[in-house]
Curated annotation (Swiss-Prot):
Tagged with keyword Electron transport: no
GO molecular function: rRNA binding; structural constituent of ribosome; tRNA binding
Membership in a protein family: Belongs to the universal ribosomal protein uS7 family.
Name of the protein this chain belongs to: Small ribosomal subunit protein uS7
Subunit text: Part of the 30S ribosomal subunit. Contacts proteins S9 and S11.
Cross-referenced HAMAP family: Ribosomal_uS7_B
Matches recorded under Pfam families: Ribosomal_S7 (PF00177)
Function: One of the primary rRNA binding proteins, it binds directly to 16S rRNA where it nucleates assembly of the head domain of the 30S subunit. Is located at the subunit interface close to the decoding center, probably blocks exit of the E-site tRNA.
Lineage of origin: Bacteria, Pseudomonadati, Pseudomonadota, Betaproteobacteria, Neisseriales
Length: 156
């Protein structure tokens, strides 16, 4: 634990186009080397593609995709008597959002489309409809937690 005072959390401003704090957070997750304008261009381009492809409001598809990707439980390693156990723990809300955004970003980067905005649009549409790489990752994490349910009494 640091001995200095606790650093206050910075407030994230909502994005100018949609007024969504989650969208700004996602841009920050997507950003590489501090190039926020590039991240903004990718996200807004992807949202335009989503509106073209689905005909639904892009921000709704985005919110649905993130909500579907949020994990409920995950496993953490805990050492007990010389053995490491994968202990299932509930994920706190702020971490749920962060993990979901990270998984959507990583799944989009692995896709085969030509540009990042097309990849991101495809992944967001897939995640909102209950499929895609981000949901595969979530299911994998849930499976791990389910498999190690027996160790849940080793809580943190």
């Amino acid at each position: 634990m640091p001995r200095r005072r606790e650093v206050p959390k910075r407030d994230v401003l909502p994005d100018p186009k949609f007024g969504s704090v989650e969208l700004t957070k996602f841009m920050n997750v997507l950003m590489i080397d501090g190039k926020k304008s590039v991240a903004e261009r990718i996200v807004y381009g992807a949202l335009e593609q989503i509106e073209k492809k689905t005909g639904k409001a892009a921000i709704e598809v985005f919110n649905e995709a993130i909500a579907n990707s949020k994990p409920i439980v995950e496993v953490k390693s805990r050492r007990v008597g010389g053995a490491n156990y994968q202990v299932p723990v509930e994920v706190r809300p702020s971490r749920r959002l962060a993990l979901a955004m990270r998984w959507v970003r990583d799944a989009a980067r692995k896709r085969g489309e030509k540009s990042m905005d097309l990849r991101l649009a495809g992944e967001l549409i897939d995640a909102s409809e209950g499929r895609g790489g981000a949901l595969k990752k979530r299911e994998e994490v849930h499976r791990m937690a389910e498999a190690n349910k027996a160790f849940s009494h080793f809580r943190f």
